Amino acid sequence: MRDSPTHKEQRAQNTMSDQMPFPFNNFTYFFTLFSKFFSSFHHCTCSLSVSRQYLALDGIYHPLRAAFPNNSTLRRHFTKNRTPRHTGFSPSMTSCSKEHRQGTAPKLPSPNYNSGTEGTRFQI
Protein backbone atom coordinates (compact mmCIF):
# COMPACT_ATOMS: atom_id res chain seq x y z
CA MET A 1 0.00 0.00 0.00
CA ARG A 2 1.36 3.42 -0.97
CA ASP A 3 1.07 6.56 1.14
CA SER A 4 1.41 9.18 -1.58
CA PRO A 5 0.77 9.25 -5.34
CA THR A 6 3.68 9.10 -7.75
CA HIS A 7 4.89 12.21 -9.55
CA LYS A 8 3.11 11.09 -12.77
CA GLU A 9 -0.21 10.53 -10.94
CA GLN A 10 0.07 13.88 -9.15
CA ARG A 11 0.70 15.69 -12.46
CA ALA A 12 -2.30 13.92 -14.05
CA GLN A 13 -4.53 14.97 -11.12
CA ASN A 14 -3.37 18.59 -11.39
CA THR A 15 -4.02 18.59 -15.15
CA MET A 16 -7.52 17.17 -14.65
CA SER A 17 -8.36 19.74 -11.97
CA ASP A 18 -7.20 22.53 -14.28
CA GLN A 19 -9.47 21.28 -17.06
CA MET A 20 -12.56 20.58 -14.93
CA PRO A 21 -13.62 23.65 -12.95
CA PHE A 22 -16.70 21.97 -11.40
CA PRO A 23 -16.57 19.32 -8.68
CA PHE A 24 -18.24 16.01 -9.47
CA ASN A 25 -19.75 15.45 -6.04
CA ASN A 26 -23.37 16.65 -5.91
CA PHE A 27 -23.04 18.07 -9.42
CA THR A 28 -26.34 18.81 -11.13
CA TYR A 29 -27.29 20.29 -14.48
CA PHE A 30 -29.97 22.93 -14.82
CA PHE A 31 -31.60 23.09 -18.23
CA THR A 32 -32.47 26.38 -19.83
CA LEU A 33 -35.53 27.02 -22.00
CA PHE A 34 -33.47 25.87 -24.99
CA SER A 35 -32.98 22.12 -24.71
CA LYS A 36 -29.67 22.00 -26.59
CA PHE A 37 -27.93 24.20 -24.01
CA PHE A 38 -27.21 23.32 -20.40
CA SER A 39 -25.42 24.97 -17.56
CA SER A 40 -24.22 24.20 -14.07
CA PHE A 41 -25.88 27.32 -12.64
CA HIS A 42 -29.38 28.77 -12.68
CA HIS A 43 -30.40 31.03 -15.53
CA CYS A 44 -33.07 33.38 -14.24
CA THR A 45 -35.70 34.49 -16.71
CA CYS A 46 -37.78 36.66 -14.41
CA SER A 47 -37.07 39.62 -12.20
CA LEU A 48 -36.94 39.32 -8.44
CA SER A 49 -39.95 41.57 -8.16
CA VAL A 50 -42.33 38.83 -9.27
CA SER A 51 -44.47 37.28 -6.63
CA ARG A 52 -43.22 34.62 -4.26
CA GLN A 53 -45.07 31.74 -5.92
CA TYR A 54 -43.39 32.25 -9.29
CA LEU A 55 -39.97 32.15 -7.66
CA ALA A 56 -40.95 28.81 -6.08
CA LEU A 57 -39.95 30.05 -2.65
CA ASP A 58 -42.89 28.30 -1.07
CA GLY A 59 -41.41 24.83 -1.77
CA ILE A 60 -44.06 23.77 -4.29
CA TYR A 61 -43.46 23.15 -7.99
CA HIS A 62 -45.25 25.69 -10.16
CA PRO A 63 -45.55 25.13 -13.91
CA LEU A 64 -43.67 27.58 -16.10
CA ARG A 65 -46.85 28.64 -17.87
CA ALA A 66 -48.18 30.02 -14.58
CA ALA A 67 -45.59 32.80 -14.68
CA PHE A 68 -46.74 34.13 -18.05
CA PRO A 69 -50.25 35.45 -18.74
CA ASN A 70 -52.14 33.83 -21.61
CA ASN A 71 -52.87 37.17 -23.24
CA SER A 72 -49.40 38.72 -23.01
CA THR A 73 -49.60 40.00 -26.59
CA LEU A 74 -53.08 41.43 -26.09
CA ARG A 75 -52.24 43.72 -23.18
CA ARG A 76 -54.00 47.03 -22.98
CA HIS A 77 -52.10 50.24 -22.73
CA PHE A 78 -52.30 51.69 -19.25
CA THR A 79 -51.50 55.26 -20.26
CA LYS A 80 -54.17 57.61 -21.46
CA ASN A 81 -53.92 58.88 -24.97
CA ARG A 82 -53.63 62.64 -24.74
CA THR A 83 -55.05 64.90 -27.33
CA PRO A 84 -52.21 66.26 -29.43
CA ARG A 85 -51.33 69.87 -28.82
CA HIS A 86 -50.40 72.24 -31.56
CA THR A 87 -46.78 73.33 -31.64
CA GLY A 88 -46.83 75.51 -34.73
CA PHE A 89 -44.82 73.02 -36.76
CA SER A 90 -46.42 71.19 -39.64
CA PRO A 91 -46.72 68.26 -39.43
CA SER A 92 -46.64 68.35 -35.67
CA MET A 93 -44.09 65.69 -34.71
CA THR A 94 -42.70 67.43 -31.64
CA SER A 95 -44.22 67.83 -28.23
CA CYS A 96 -45.04 71.17 -26.71
CA SER A 97 -42.27 72.79 -24.74
CA LYS A 98 -42.74 73.55 -21.05
CA GLU A 99 -43.43 77.22 -21.70
CA HIS A 100 -46.39 76.45 -23.97
CA ARG A 101 -48.10 73.85 -21.81
CA GLN A 102 -51.22 74.78 -19.92
CA GLY A 103 -50.99 75.07 -16.16
CA THR A 104 -48.11 76.13 -13.99
CA ALA A 105 -44.68 74.60 -13.89
CA PRO A 106 -43.86 72.59 -10.77
CA LYS A 107 -42.04 74.54 -8.11
CA LEU A 108 -38.39 73.56 -7.82
CA PRO A 109 -37.04 72.74 -4.37
CA SER A 110 -34.89 75.26 -2.59
CA PRO A 111 -31.13 74.87 -3.09
CA ASN A 112 -30.87 74.65 0.71
CA TYR A 113 -33.46 71.87 0.95
CA ASN A 114 -31.32 69.50 3.01
CA SER A 115 -29.52 72.18 4.97
CA GLY A 116 -30.40 72.85 8.56
CA THR A 117 -30.26 76.23 10.25
CA GLU A 118 -26.85 75.43 11.70
CA GLY A 119 -23.84 74.47 9.65
CA THR A 120 -22.89 70.86 9.15
CA ARG A 121 -20.59 69.54 11.84
CA PHE A 122 -18.26 66.69 11.08
CA GLN A 123 -16.66 64.93 13.99
CA ILE A 124 -13.86 62.41 13.93
UniProtKB/Swiss-Prot annotation:
Protein's cellular compartments: Mitochondrion
Q: Which residues form the signal peptide?
A: none
Composition-biased stretches (Polar residues): 111-124
Q: Name one GO biological process term.
A: regulation of cellular respiration
Gene Ontology cellular component annotations, sorted alphabetically: mitochondrion
Q: List the disulfide bonds.
A: none
User: Per its database record, what is this protein's job?
Assistant: May be involved in mtDNA stability or mitochondrial gene expression regulation at the post-transcriptional level.
What is the protein's given name?
Protein TAR1
